[in-house]
Amino acid sequence: MAPDGAVRGSAGDPDLAGLYRATATPARVDVPQLQCLMVDGAGDPETTPAYADAVGTLYAVSYGLRFMAKAIGEQPWKVGPLEGLWWADDPDAFLTDTRAEWRWTMLIVQPTRVTADLVGRALDAAVAKGRAPAAEHLHLDVLDEGTAFQVLHVGPYDAEGPTIAGLHRAIAEQGYALRGAHHEIYLGDPRRSAPERLRTIIRQPVQAPEDVPQG
């Protein structure tokens, strides 16, 4: 469901720049509510047409919103990176690489000035140009992760395993528990970067120590 208006906090706001920085050492971050364009789907991202459709639609509408702002004299913003939330009904689907069972929400965070009305206009323009194949699945929504840990992975996506294991280990060592979907922020474009140079922030929302069941 799209919110009635803008939600405080987005990747377009300077005070959130820290959310898009990470190092090889896992660190805790406090993530405010973020307004996002989202498309939900399922299946192998490398072979499922719906995945490519989702990504193409997100970029088309996000850049359309930026150009609309520029056209009316507003200061344009930089379009944020592609992000993905990943989960499966059976968590073992990730351990066994059973990609057909993967579920995902691809998203791009939007500035606070973006409203549902603006999104509708940008989407209509993208549809008219044939650039929004996932138009019926696009929605403006709020991502509310709260406390999380994140780490930078450098290298191919299919080599993230040790980085994720290290992140989960750091979370457990500090008394937190995993909560919510696995979150990836793609700082590198696989179409333009060698696999070994891809940079991905891996974020995991957590449950506070005092809320973790004991014994």
Question: What label would you give each PLM region?
Answer:
Residues M1-G215:
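A solvent-exposed interaction/effector surface
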